[in-house]
Amino acid sequence: MTAANQETILELRDVKKYFPIRSGLFQRKVGDVKAVDGVSFSLKKGETLGIVGESGCGKSTAGRTMIRLYKPTEGQILFKGQDISNLSEEKLRKSVRKNIQMVFQDPFASLNPRKTLRSIIKEPFNTHNMYTMRERNEKVEELLARVGLHPSFAGRYPHEFSGGQRQRIGIARALTLNPELIIADEPVSALDVSIQAQVINLMEELQEEFNLTYLFISHDLSVVRHISDRVGVMYLGKMMELTGKHELYDNPLHPYTQALLSSVPVTRKRGSVKRERIVLKGELPSPANPPKGCVFHTRCPVAKPICKEQIPEFKEAAPSHFVACHLYS
């Protein structure tokens, strides 16, 4: 779904999320894990923005910070123009929670094993005091049917279902309050490839039907390419590159993005140019002690002296194509 000329539903302005490192008998603070370190972008109503990167890059923490499961250390999070960065839990529940929901990576761990599907899915109705008991039960059955599960399953427990079915249950729960934005954190990474396709297709159908906006977090570049309108690439808590999916996959600018895309297996037409495989040296540095300057310079194959000293500005290097790299300064 295109996001051209549409309103901004979510905006991050230099958002940081640090976790304190404590040590010693009195648990004094000795440092910070910089999980998210100065991320800025906006999300348009009706679009799907994919966020990709290696494990430990901060993408899941960024998603949980956006929905205020974590309170940001610094920066602003604006939902439909309202700054929700410092709202109390009560105000979040009244003005934000209904409109932003999350689908988690592990479809089993995110469901209470002691509760039936009916209890799990209608819990948001209970929390927000919506509908009569009869209407709540009817809504549960409607939601189960909409995600491809038989309404008679409402009395069963999560352990009775497969991984793909459990993820459908998680999606049904996320839809209960008619949200405008759904943050999907690796929603298909724990599923078989054939089941992944079914869940992705379901999410696309639901987006069209309910006019949803998605923030889709994944390490799988192929899945992100299929579902996203724009794609952002994160590395060590920072946004490296952000642009439309076709532009990113056809013309990646940042050396890290180029390395990621070179690792994706592709089928080529006869006569097409083969993309050179770029192998990054070394391990991902610790977010507790990120490199000075550009955080990627320790693994970058084209690093310059300035990369070791100065943090590159995240700026527009081409129309609607943002990148944080000194090569485009």
UniProtKB/Swiss-Prot annotation:
<feature type="binding site">
    <location>
        <begin position="53"/>
        <end position="60"/>
    </location>
    <ligand>
        <name>ATP</name>
    </ligand>
</feature>
<dbReference type="GO" id="GO:0030435">
    <property type="term" value="P:sporulation resulting in formation of a cellular spore"/>
</dbReference>
<dbReference type="GO" id="GO:0015833">
    <property type="term" value="P:peptide transport"/>
</dbReference>
<dbReference type="GO" id="GO:0016887">
    <property type="term" value="F:ATP hydrolysis activity"/>
</dbReference>
<keyword id="KW-0653">Protein transport</keyword>
<dbReference type="GO" id="GO:0030420">
    <property type="term" value="P:establishment of competence for transformation"/>
</dbReference>
<protein>
    <recommendedName>
        <fullName>Oligopeptide transport ATP-binding protein AppF</fullName>
    </recommendedName>
</protein>
<dbReference type="InterPro" id="IPR003593">
    <property type="entry name" value="AAA+_ATPase"/>
</dbReference>
<dbReference type="InterPro" id="IPR017871">
    <property type="entry name" value="ABC_transporter-like_CS"/>
</dbReference>
<keyword id="KW-0547">Nucleotide-binding</keyword>
<dbReference type="InterPro" id="IPR050319">
    <property type="entry name" value="ABC_transp_ATP-bind"/>
</dbReference>
<dbReference type="InterPro" id="IPR003439">
    <property type="entry name" value="ABC_transporter-like_ATP-bd"/>
</dbReference>
<comment type="similarity">
    <text>Belongs to the ABC transporter superfamily.</text>
</comment>
<keyword id="KW-0813">Transport</keyword>
<dbReference type="Pfam" id="PF00005">
    <property type="entry name" value="ABC_tran"/>
</dbReference>
<keyword id="KW-0067">ATP-binding</keyword>
<comment type="function">
    <text>This protein is a component of an oligopeptide permease, a binding protein-dependent transport system. This APP system can completely substitute for the OPP system in both sporulation and genetic competence, though, unlike OPP, is incapable of transporting tripeptides. Probably responsible for energy coupling to the transport system.</text>
</comment>
<dbReference type="GO" id="GO:0005524">
    <property type="term" value="F:ATP binding"/>
</dbReference>
<keyword id="KW-0571">Peptide transport</keyword>
<keyword id="KW-0749">Sporulation</keyword>
<keyword id="KW-0472">Membrane</keyword>
<dbReference type="InterPro" id="IPR013563">
    <property type="entry name" value="Oligopep_ABC_C"/>
</dbReference>
<dbReference type="InterPro" id="IPR027417">
    <property type="entry name" value="P-loop_NTPase"/>
</dbReference>
<keyword id="KW-1003">Cell membrane</keyword>
<dbReference type="Pfam" id="PF08352">
    <property type="entry name" value="oligo_HPY"/>
</dbReference>
<dbReference type="GO" id="GO:0055085">
    <property type="term" value="P:transmembrane transport"/>
</dbReference>
<dbReference type="GO" id="GO:0005886">
    <property type="term" value="C:plasma membrane"/>
</dbReference>
<keyword id="KW-0178">Competence</keyword>
<feature type="domain" description="ABC transporter">
    <location>
        <begin position="10"/>
        <end position="261"/>
    </location>
</feature>
<dbReference type="GO" id="GO:0015031">
    <property type="term" value="P:protein transport"/>
</dbReference>
